[in-house]
Regions:
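Small-residue-rich helix-loop
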Residues: 3-105
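Metal- and O2-centered redox machinery and metal/ROS homeostasis
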Residues: 155
């Protein structure tokens, strides 16, 4: 298995080919473990890593049509508010806050997880949701959830 520094150097040109100039090396190192096992080539890794670097993430039209629907808008906005003050910003803490919020609001994981995934990644398939949030960081996670809430609501 290629060591992380070598992999980072090798995948960077493929990210540039996707229009992502000079990807942040620290962000790349943080995101890499979440996509590396599934990527068979550096090009596949660059595709899998794309949404960690692109603002806003490219939306898969089918995923958006299926999951960013009007009913999802309020939930995504409320989720953004519920996560905005999480500290420390780690996957386990985010999951705990998310599940507490679900219980408090009477929502089901199935109602919110896929719309949140599409909001954060632009796709219906990704690494675990809380890992994605942890790598994206609080500002981008909350901003993407709010943008998707507005989109889902038709605004």
């Amino acid at each position: 298995l290629t060591d992380t520094d070598t992999y980072v150097t090798a995948v960077a040109p493929f990210l540039r080919d996707r229009g992502l100039a000079a990807p942040d090396a620290d962000l790349l190192r943080a995101a890499l473990p979440h996509v590396r096992a599934r990527a068979r080539t550096y090009a596949e890794a660059a595709f899998a890593l794309d949404y960690f670097f692109r603002e806003p993430p490219e939306l898969d039209a089918q995923a958006a049509a299926r999951f960013l629907v009007p009913d999802a808008g309020p939930a995504l906005g409320e989720l953004a508010d519920a996560l905005a003050d999480v500290t420390p910003w780690r996957a386990d803490v985010l999951e705990e806050r998310f599940r507490t919020w679900l219980e408090r609001t009477g929502r089901d994981l199935k109602q919110v997880a896929q719309p949140a995934r599409v909001a954060l990644t632009g796709r219906s398939a990704s690494p675990p949701l809380f890992d994605v949030m942890a790598v994206l960081g609080p500002a981008r996670t909350v901003a993407r959830l709010r943008a998707a809430a507005a989109m889902a609501a038709g605004g």
